[in-house]
Amino acid sequence: MQLDEDLEFAKKIFNPNRAFAKQARIKNMCEYKDLVHEANEDYEHFWGELAKQKLTWFKPFDKVLNSDNAPFFKWFENGKINVSYNCIDRHLKDKKNKVAIIFEGEMGDYNVITYRKLHSEVNKTANLLKNEFNVKKGDRVIIYMPMIVESVYMMLACARIGAIHSIVFAGFSPEALRDRINDAQAKLVITADGTFRKGKPYMLKPALDKALENNACPSVEKALIVIRNAREIDYVRGRDFVYNEMVNYQSDKCEPEMMDSEDPLFLLYTSGSTGKPKGVQHSSAGYLLWAQMTMEWVFDIRDNDNFWCTADIGWITGHTYVVYGPLACGATTLILEGTMSYPDYGRWWRMIEEYRVDKFYTSPTAIRMLHAKGENEPLKYNLESLKVLGTVGEPINPTAWKWFYEKIGNSKCSIVDTWWQTETGGHIISPLPGATPIRASCATLPLPGIHAEVLNEDGTKTKPGEQGFLCITKPWPSMVRNIWGDEKRYIDSYFSQIKLNGEYVYLSGDGAIVDENGYITIIGRTDDIVNVSGHRIGTAEVESAISKHEMVVECAVVGIPDTIKGEGLFAFVVLCDGAKCNLGESLELLKEMNHILSVEIGKIAKLDNVMYVPGLPKTRSGKIMRRLLKSIAKKEPITQDLSTLEDVNVVKEIMSIVQMEE
């Protein structure tokens, strides 16, 4: 895309599709503002009414919000509920034969699970955990599983009997798995023999064996193994048991445990943390309410919709928008075992056509990859079923946004560019597809009931166009409740740096800019903000600008020490296929990229170093490992865990380039 065209495109406002808006839950900005006003007028009444209307309670709550021990807030106090019941049982009267889950395996196999079947399988699994493994309310269960339907059964079975599940992403190393098991003091670990990835078997059980060897996890009593790829594995007698052989002997009737609103539903350890893992603790009622509300508001989920979120269940997006959100709404959710590129880069588009997907939610990294590797693949498929597109995980640059909007959504689907975190449980800032005028790469407005503000360090609001810290200034139901076993770390991490009206507010760790209309644009992590000669520059906006060069497929920018400026900008750049970059071309390309930066951001944003690389190191969830790139740029030893990488060879190739340049 030409720079001038891109600048104009980024300013353009896209109004919701009129036909879609007419039938949407929130049809226009007036209705959005009415909800915001309602929440502001009586905050507790607003949330209390939603909880009464949307959730099924065994015993009603008697207090909406208890702030006596802030920041350890309690929502819907003394209410009794069960998340599994709300995701399955309450739908059985009218939807027992409706499809709950559509599963497609990497090798092309598929399975369709109705709500009745889901109820039966979850109950049998819950009974297995209780009867054979002595799992009780409050026990922690580690789930180290691939994207298969049994993973959902395990989650909901834990919720049914009151156990606290903690999913560890199946790409994590044995060491990372061990750390999480020990921090949670888990009684049981559930894994699979393996899965299929890129058309080949990929093993998981050996990683569990290594994590548990030499009694390294003394809290673990037993391990439960799901047979998926049927490759040979080792068994430890008395410890390892096969799920497939045991589950069908269990009754398909299991009464749901009555849980307090504030009882923990799950722990999820934040990715990329250093030192002791940080177990984000989420509650039952508040989390589920917001999972359901954001499905209804942000995706405008409908009874006959097929919803597909491409995230892995090892991340919060998979928890909320693959499992709990869709099922709480009684919707149909899709699960794909494998990758976007096998057998080719048309896989996702074929699935959208075949399963008539209505709402599609994925990451900017995936969009950029599909654009670069298979730009014309979508043209081979009928994507007319799509009504809403969504992005999650990082800011999306205008070029990727434009391709997603025009080629995938046929210029008729709203893109909900959602901002939220593991700690928030669900969306915080997002357009509403039937109401919000959208702009490329802009998260737009806080959802009703959410008080998200951009503040300076002293707690004052930033002026329009100024960078600041994105904070949430009032508690909300799905917020993180604690860091497992570490209250001090919870306070230090989120409620210790910025005050508003004398009270500490939730600090997200993200930087943002608010414009004169209240629209919020995320500029990246505050630790991804580079201070160049006293000017704070978000690496995300630098990357977005560089990506507008026609030869650049994608890039990652990090800050490096500079004796004059404090910090300088170092870019790792992936060029389009066939592009060659000798010394002369390299200097010319650097000049062109810096020109784009000077136009888009200002002359202060200037690349000091560029390394042209064949690819960027990414986790299997699609996130770029920026800390690793920063170590490379600063010529420091690589100490990061590389086991989560999609392709370790990328790092080896980058290191070879570094050695050649030394």
UniProtKB/Swiss-Prot annotation:
Biological processes annotated in GO: acetyl-CoA biosynthetic process from acetate
PTM note: Acetylated. Deacetylation by the SIR2-homolog deacetylase activates the enzyme.
EC number: 6.2.1.1
Cofactor(s) needed: Mg(2+)
PTM annotation (N6-acetyllysine): residues: K623
Keywords tagged on the record: Acetylation, ATP-binding, Ligase, Magnesium, Metal-binding, Nucleotide-binding
Entries under CDD domains matching the protein: ACS
Enzyme class: ligase
Superkingdom of the source species: Bacteria
Pfam families reported for this sequence: ACAS_N, AMP-binding, AMP-binding_C
GO MF terms held by the record: acetate-CoA ligase activity; AMP binding; ATP binding; metal ion binding
Catalytic reaction list: acetate + ATP + CoA = acetyl-CoA + AMP + diphosphate
Protein's UniProt keywords contain Mitochondrion: no
GO cellular component, one term: cytosol
SUPFAM superfamilies: Acetyl-CoA synthetase-like
Residues binding Mg(2+): H549, V552
UniProt-annotated binding residues for CoA: R197, K198, G199, K200, T317, S533
Binding site for ATP: G393, E394, P395, D417, T418, W419, W420, Q421, T422, D510, R525, R536
Family membership: Belongs to the ATP-dependent AMP-binding enzyme family.
Annotated function: Catalyzes the conversion of acetate into acetyl-CoA (AcCoA), an essential intermediate at the junction of anabolic and catabolic pathways. AcsA undergoes a two-step reaction. In the first half reaction, AcsA combines acetate with ATP to form acetyl-adenylate (AcAMP) intermediate. In the second half reaction, it can then transfer the acetyl group from AcAMP to the sulfhydryl group of CoA, forming the product AcCoA.
PANTHER family hit by this protein: ACETYL-COENZYME A SYNTHETASE (PTHR24095), ACETYL-COENZYME A SYNTHETASE 1 (PTHR24095:SF14)
Protein name: Acetyl-coenzyme A synthetase
Protein source organism: Helicobacter pylori (strain P12)
Taxonomic lineage of the native organism: Bacteria, Pseudomonadati, Campylobacterota, Epsilonproteobacteria, Campylobacterales
